Amino acid sequence: MKHFGYLILPMMIFSSGYAYAGILNGTADDGTACSSSSPMMTADGSCRATPSKYVVTIYEMGVCTEDPFNGHANVSMDKSSCSVVFQNSTGFTNDYAASIGTAVAMTGTSSRPANGTYKYPYMIMKNEFTVNGSFTSNGTTYYSTGSGSAASSGTAAEYIDTLRNFGGPKCYSGYPDATIAGVGTISAYLVNSSLVRADEDDVSAGNCTGIDRMVGMMNLDAPFTISENT
């Protein structure tokens, strides 16, 4: 049975980890694309492909002039340098795989950011994603299953992927600096509703406890400026 990841954002793969105080960060990689020829991936490995369905619930989006996680060292998100551009307290849910290349009318409160130069866009979302899809390699089509693996027969089934840890056996609540070539890096943090990261010892059965959000944040190679003429 094959295992492969469906992500629109770069796939995040963990190796070693490093720590600041009581919080732990994994080491990010952008992953390897699934191959349409044999082998699709290395033995016992994983690969990334674009899904047919990728449902995400978004609570907030914004832009910051300074890193709100201070180089992955902050326990809580510091939004003092940030401008919020979208908010929905109950969350806006959408299938973003189906929306590729189209405009999405998001339900919530939209705001113009304050004038300034921004390097750190962020998104606060639910740490639960609904995905399905298929991928054909060397003449065999693999379909997603409800358990998160893949099968070579049947039809693609939905899988609810809940991110509860970026490593283990302790709680790894940070996933820093996956590279997006020509754009910058992307990091992710598992947080509670107050945007506080789980401590390394906040873990049960291999999962970080008290988590119900994920913050995705980019560090842009080229910051952008909002002015009165924008």
Spans of features found by a protein language model:
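Initiator methionine at the very start of the polypeptide chain
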Residues: 1-2, 21
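Sec-dependent signal peptide recognition
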Residues: 2-9
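N-terminal signal peptide c-region/cleavage motif recognized by signal peptidases
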Residues: 14-16
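A short, solvent-exposed, low-complexity linear motif enriched for acidic/polar residues
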Residues: 20-230
